[in-house]
Amino acid sequence: MFLNPVVPNGYYNLRGGAMQSKATPIREDGIYHSFCGLVSVGWLYQKIKDSFFLILGTHTCAHLLQNTLGVMIFARPRFAVSLLEESDLSSSQPDISAQIEEIKREHHPSVIFLLSSCTPEVMKVEFEGLAASVSTPEVPVLFVPASGLDYTFSQSEDSVLQALIPFCPPAPPDDKRVVFLGSVNDAIADDFSLEAARLGIPVAGFLPASHFTELPPIGPGTVIAPLQPYLHKTATQLRNERGCTVLSSLFPFGPDGTRRFWEDLAAQFGMQVDLSEREAAAWERIKHHTDLLRGKKIFFASDTLMELPLARFLKACGAEVVECSTPYINRRFHAAELAALDGVRLVEQANFHRQLRTITETKPDLIISNIITTNPLVGQGTVAKWGTEYCFLPIHGWAGVNNLVTSFTRALQRHARLDPLGSDPIWLTGMMPGSSGGVISLQS
């Protein structure tokens, strides 16, 4: 069943008129995602500094978080896994009250997020009731659906922000300020605050804020400016429940996206700004890197929901985007990005076997792939890099331009330096099971 909303007759463009998009995504039958959404805890617990994230899960969940995030238990991070044991299988509802009290005693959080995982979802644990049973007005416990059965790697942040909406104070209709939507590190947040002040745009804050007690007021006069391309549920809920305006623009990745983002945001406040010189200067600073990317064939096969703006940026750099696949595309929320990707092959839920054939035929210079397929693709001699790292990199706005472009060029330059060593069997021995100096075909 196709669930994404289709907006007839084009999309609303803040610059005026209807914005027609000729980019028509193809829907295939591949997997929805390949990396667990619980890993979003890795950047969210650092962003919301007075929070604690408790995952109800299994030993597999605990191993995933410890190995993926590289945090040892003695570091006392502000997240943990409440392990389900065999005895819990026969109980109607797990008891986490002891863990909640221990978390309050040792970490003193202002809010606790209770995240679901695959096993308790299958067990039909009633998470909302479980969270309500241990929640208090002083320290609310908020249920966050994050099971890998239903959510992509980055979508769990969308669930966390939805849980925070009731705690954002209401703003009066005449309070017209912007709220930046999406988790970015403090340096990037400061850059956006300074740029807004430079342009004369009033800022109410960020969602999520650095502290639970500092959530921004949101009301009918608020302009929501999404920073991340995977937050359409939060944006839709804010528009429906608070009556605020959701900015429809390019996401602030790269000089082109950042310029368009700020110009469209300023237009919401009745200001016309021209940032063409700022954009040109940003392109000039990364000219060495764009020269390397120009003409290169790039293939997106990742699953972070950041693929559309990344592909649009590479297209602006002069690269040839052979294909951009992503778990899903929301035609309304991603309208501006779709319009900018006219002529690029866009695929939802791509069939990986078909992608392998396309990769063999087109021979891309760089593949942005998911965590399952990157190493096997490298083993076949292609240049591939994880798409997951883009969720952790500071690549937003003017301050993030250099980090964004070098994330692509470093992969190409590294391969060029290692290529002379690639024929040595020592690099391939043991890479795939049963392989002695060679690589098992992914199609076998």
UniProtKB/Swiss-Prot annotation:
Pathway in which this enzyme or protein is active = Porphyrin-containing compound metabolism; bacteriochlorophyll biosynthesis (light-independent)
Q: Which cofactor does it need?
A: [4Fe-4S] cluster
UniProt cross-references to InterPro entries, sorted A to Z: LIPOR_BchN/ChlN, Nase/OxRdtase_comp1, Protochl_reductN
Return the Pfam families for the record: Oxidored_nitro
Q: How is the cofactor bound?
A: Binds 1 [4Fe-4S] cluster per heterodimer. The cluster is bound at the heterodimer interface by residues from both subunits.
- Quaternary organization: Protochlorophyllide reductase is composed of three subunits; BchL, BchN and BchB. Forms a heterotetramer of two BchB and two BchN subunits.
Name of the protein described by the UniProt record = Light-independent protochlorophyllide reductase subunit N
Q: Which organism is it from?
A: Chloroflexus aurantiacus (strain ATCC 29366 / DSM 635 / J-10-fl)
Taxonomic lineage of this organism?
Bacteria, Bacillati, Chloroflexota, Chloroflexia, Chloroflexales
Gene encoding the protein: bchN
